[in-house]
Curated annotation (Swiss-Prot):
Record-linked CDD domains: crotonase-like
Keyword Membrane: no
Domain of life according to the entry: Eukaryota
Lineage: Eukaryota, Metazoa, Chordata, Craniata, Vertebrata
Residues that, per the record, bind substrate: 120, 145, 168, 176
Gene behind this protein: hibch
GO process annotations (BP): valine catabolic process
Function: Hydrolyzes 3-hydroxyisobutyryl-CoA (HIBYL-CoA), a saline catabolite. Has high activity toward isobutyryl-CoA. Could be an isobutyryl-CoA dehydrogenase that functions in valine catabolism. Also hydrolyzes 3-hydroxypropanoyl-CoA.
Organism: Xenopus tropicalis
Name of the protein this chain belongs to: 3-hydroxyisobutyryl-CoA hydrolase, mitochondrial
Amino acid sequence: MSLGLLESQLRLKVFGRLQVIRQHLRMTNHTVKDGECLLTKAGCAGVITLNRPKALNALNLGMIRLIYPQLGLWEEDPETYLVIIKGVGGKAFCAGGDIRAVTDAGKAGDRLAQDFFREEYILNNAIGTYKKPYVALIDGITMGGGVGLSVHGHFRVASENTLFAMPETAIGLFPDVGGGYFLPRLPGKLGLYLALTGFRLKGSDVQKAGIATHFVESEKIPSLEQDLVAMKCPSKENVADVLDSYHNKSYAAQDKPFVLAEHLDKINSLFSASSVEAIIENLRCDGSSFALKQLQTLSTMSPTSLKITFRQLKEGSSMSLQEVLTMEYRLSQACMKGYDFYEGVRAVLIDKNQNAKWNPELLEEVTDDYIDSYFTSLGNSDLKL
């Protein structure tokens, strides 16, 4: 072998090793810290435990990259019959995505702003199309990304500790993770109301709204989990029977009327308008204390987010989950290039002074052409499911 050829091969080896190191460094910037997401096998079940209690189990990219492939392995494993996902810490199932990290990445032009949304939505789709029973124990705060980890699965078990909301219009975003799919499929205009106002549902109301499938008292959830993992080769029907049994014993919560029951007629009529502006006008004309409260709430939200969200749910009502997630990825990337998302995060999560200065500031300044741009195809960069 000539000296020149040997030197050439050595350079190639060194270059290849440097490429591997660079790739590793890029990946470890967003990998999961030890123990942030635990993946275990218990009896017949694969168990996902979100383990960031100090961050209210907020979902980061590293956790997504652990959960997604493991779901695929369990789906093909003949010894795994169901999947259970839960959070630790006593306060939250999952309070959302790691918005701070996404915000910083968006400002810096880091590809995390693309990767996070793309891989999160791919995970949402995997949950929504999962072949085996998927049980989310949403015993605590469940917002944003936490909704995406639960609502598309077969079973969602709420407790008195559950706090559900999709508050994205307050931070210049939109109710993503498939919100355009499940929200317009709630009864009447309830989903649109929740999406625009960010109204919070608690406890058994989460089940009454149709977001959770079952309600079980928090103290009984460990026993429920034990009964689920102890089953022998359970079918989806067997899992449902166990969940139904626990739910049916929770009479106290079922006896309470739905928190929005007295307002549903107004919600269905006032929010059935053909535009956000028309909804605002309906609320003004109604003049009831309920309507005036909604006006006050909507006045604090990003006008751009309100219009994006209205169209998102309107179009999503006739789309498949895959089509919705593709649409939402386009919206996410448009928001990353805009202004309101960063301003909303500053006002709500960083400075916490709630005084966001939206741009455009008024609903009438948000043109149809501007909203159209948010829904434009990304071509080769579109989400592929």
